[in-house]
UniProtKB/Swiss-Prot annotation:
Keyword Nucleus part of the UniProt annotation: no
Coiled coil residues, start to end: none
Source species, domain of life: Eukaryota
Tissue specificity as recorded in UniProt: Expressed by the venom gland.
Protein name in UniProt: Venom protein 51.1
Main subcellular location: secreted
Record key words, sorted: Disulfide bond, Neurotoxin, Secreted, Signal, Toxin
A molecular-function term among this protein's GO annotations: toxin activity
Cysteine disulfide links: 32-53, 39-58, 43-60
Region forming the signal peptide: 1-25
Function: Neurotoxin. Decreases the action potential of myelinated nerves in mice and frogs.
GO cellular component: extracellular region
Amino acid sequence: MKFFGILLIVTMVVLVMIATTYVESISIGIKCSPSIDLCEGQCRIRKYFTGYCSGDTCHCSG
């Protein structure tokens, strides 16, 4: 049973690594304050799936 648990964990880690390889994330140089709405809107204009804040800088991914 212990072997299958380790195998499951390794498989999950590999899948996460593969998934994050295909998700492009870039900083677009926009400040997130006063709200994240501007960040999300600018990311969608640039054809990215979503926008998120890291610190006070907007990043786009997808």
